[in-house]
């Protein structure tokens, strides 16, 4: 069982490493999104550089990476505690942030982390998504909405009584905020781009 978990974790990392924004940009738009906007491989920069259609596709793909990776033990009928689903999900987040297929320069882990939560705790995903969308509607900042959504997920997770989930969501929230430190500076300086499509 230990070997199987290790293999599934490695597979989850590979799945997380799929650079959706980079590949869609290069294949369909002849653009390397690392050379435009924030230079980030995530969904937000895909929206900014490639447009709403491509950005939406990248977002869905990045969420699915987290969801599929989290469900790997289920797909392979591995008889383990559900907490191990979070292990494979965590490896997908690592893969997305430090992708094997993109020089270990990845996204900020928001969408893929959301996919992990969607697979493990769907109601928590919905609650965090509502907070994200409300914040986005008010502020027009994707970065700020992502951070507040992550913090909301952490707060709500405390009411679920699953300490393994709480620990993972706490790590996700801290990591998301850390990955957005440049965005925080730009928000303070009034230089952070606002979305125009919502």
UniProtKB/Swiss-Prot annotation:
It is found in: Cell membrane. Its main location: membrane. GO terms for biological process: phospholipid biosynthetic process. Pathway: Lipid metabolism; phospholipid metabolism. One of its GO terms (molecular function) is acyl-phosphate glycerol-3-phosphate acyltransferase activity. It is a multi-pass membrane protein. Signal peptide: none annotated. The chain crosses the membrane at residues 5-25, 56-76, 84-104, 114-134, 158-178. Probably interacts with PlsX. PANTHER family: GLYCEROL-3-PHOSPHATE ACYLTRANSFERASE-RELATED, INNER MEMBRANE PROTEIN YGIH. NCBIfam families: glycerol-3-phosphate 1-O-acyltransferase PlsY. Belongs to the PlsY family. This is Glycerol-3-phosphate acyltransferase. It comes from Listeria innocua serovar 6a (strain ATCC BAA-680 / CLIP 11262).
